[in-house]
Amino acid sequence: MKIPDEFLHHLTESHNSEMALVGCRADAPDVSYDCCEYDIAIFGENESNPQNKIVKLGNDTLEFQGFPKQSNDILLYKMIRMITGDDLLISPPRYSETDIKRSFKAAGKSRIVDALFNVSKNSINKAELNSPLNLKKAAYGLLEGILLMSEVRPMPIHELNQLRQLEVKKDIINEAIQTCIECLGVERATRTILNRSFRALKEILKERYDVELLSSKIEFLLNHKLLADCYYYIGRLVCNHLEQKNNSSQMNYYKLNSIALDLTSDYENTKKLSTLIKRDCKNLLKN
């Protein structure tokens, strides 16, 4: 496998650390979009405070991400080791199949526990301002957990398509996916709603180093009329961002979050779906 020569030249000039190509360009290059960046893992550089950054080279983009040398991040399982000044070489397996299965299952269960925690915040007895937000966060977390439990590494821009192609062997998994999709409201994806959500998202993420890259991906999905995928992706980005914020910070930006996530205020429907998500989380954690 080759990546553009200018990339290799840039890496030769800029970095002496061990590097690897990760992300969809390494894991699933056949599904990568033109807007997808080349994710470069840098091992052992500023381990206590890795400085991620974006570099534009021509029409393509590199994103550098710092990892500890002994990282067990699932992102690295199908990495392609960089040999400076040469082609890319597929790295020898660093993990046994048993270790990989165990890691995926553990990561999946962890995300489902997170989903259960979020949906459990919703009261069944009274309407609360942040109930629709908790529900969407739970739905995204549960879907991510399902992919991980199925040994599929979630790739946010491709995630809805990953779910479409997932070989579901258990009815409880299929039911959980359908419930989550209903919670997210993907069928509401119209250009009007997406344009409004996109503007709110850019305001929410304006301080992030990668906001231009994320925006270019959304524009790609819009331009290619992948409206459902775009709706899912915007929501995923917002929920990922909110997971790193405390509750007071979330409430300070509640209006923007509501617009970006296309939240509705149907209390009865939120209560019904919260009960179903809670049931699905518990069922999957038992299996």
What are these regions (language model features)?
Residues 38, 42, 62-64, 177-181:
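Generic preference for hydrophobic/aromatic residues in regular secondary structure cores
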Residues 33-35, 52-54, 76-78, 152, ...:
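General "foldedness" signal
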Residues 23-24, 85, 145:
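Glycine-centered flexibility motif
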Residues 104-287:
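Conserved nucleotidyltransferase catalytic core and NTase-mimicking acidic/glycine-rich helix/loop elements
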Residues 37-39, 80-82, 156, 165:
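Generic alpha-helical propensity signal that fires on short helical segments
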Residues 44-121, 125, 129-132:
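Conserved catalytic core of two-metal-ion nucleotidyltransferases
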Residues 5-47:
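Active-site nucleotide-donor binding segment shared across nucleotidyl transfer reactions
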